[in-house]
Amino acid sequence: MSYTIIRPKDRREWLRHRENGIGSSEVGTILGLNPYETPYQLWRRKKGLDAPKVENFAMRAGHYLEDAVSLFYRDETGKEIIKASAGDWLIVNNEKEYLRVSPDRTYWIPGRPKSDRNKGILECKTTQMEVDGDSLPQHWFCQLQYQLGVAELEQGAIAWLTMGREFGYRDLAFDKEFYDYMIEEVDRFWIDNIVGGIEPLAINVDDVLLKNPRHIIGKTVEADEELAQSCAELKEIKEELSALDTRKKDIENAIKMALGDAEALVAPGSSLAKPTILATWKAAKDSTKFDEKRFAAEKPELYAGYQYTVPGSRRFLLK
């Protein structure tokens, strides 16, 4: 075996170990296949420029529900989940220590002797989206293939629980050609971007704002024909939207005029017992608001003590 298994004493230590390399959940990001994070954002986090991800409720729930997902998989397939695989542990490549994975669960491959080589990896997911087993999210596929490669295993599966109501899974074989491609990209990212400090390119507007939160006064960029056409097209779209918004307000006001003091507008011919509601116009519940203007006037020193500066954000205007 060309890897080492690490079993940290607690979750905090496990998180520290994860920060010292590239985990399986980060590979899809490096390949540009993660819809929730870009390579530049990952780079900033790894370099300590941005705070580490804070475990939110969804992440914590997913961690707690790994047991449930693994049990569903066991019941559906009859495969034996290895109890010792639960918990926080890591597999680290001995040659490239930045290649490190933390499988959710492992299982014994049916029909084979129980040994380190005859295990499969189970990646457990909880999600709010509908999942097509024949077209898995790309970053999920990357995650499992990376785990199989680092762990030197042949088989794995992704199992998911959708909104707590639907369960699905897909068994997958290790794809060495794809794994080799991933490792080339991970090597490049680690050596050039993390160790070498080279910033990845910005691939969306969020990246641009992270790189350039303030504009350079007086600096201009000359548009090419395509960009000039884009500005003209955007101007037309804004004018169309403005006209639609005006029309929307006119129609809405006409309906409100018809309602008067009524609560609801019903369809023509609706029965009193079960009317078909077309629209309602109801008062919201009373709310309490803070009179900031009066407080500032009557308690200026106290008010000043609670003021803070918010950096100005870049505002896009079409001329």
Where in the sequence are the language-model features?
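Extended, charge-rich alpha-helical segments
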Residues: E95-E97, S242-K319
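Nucleic-acid nuclease catalytic cores
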Residues: M59-R60, D75-P103, Y107-I194
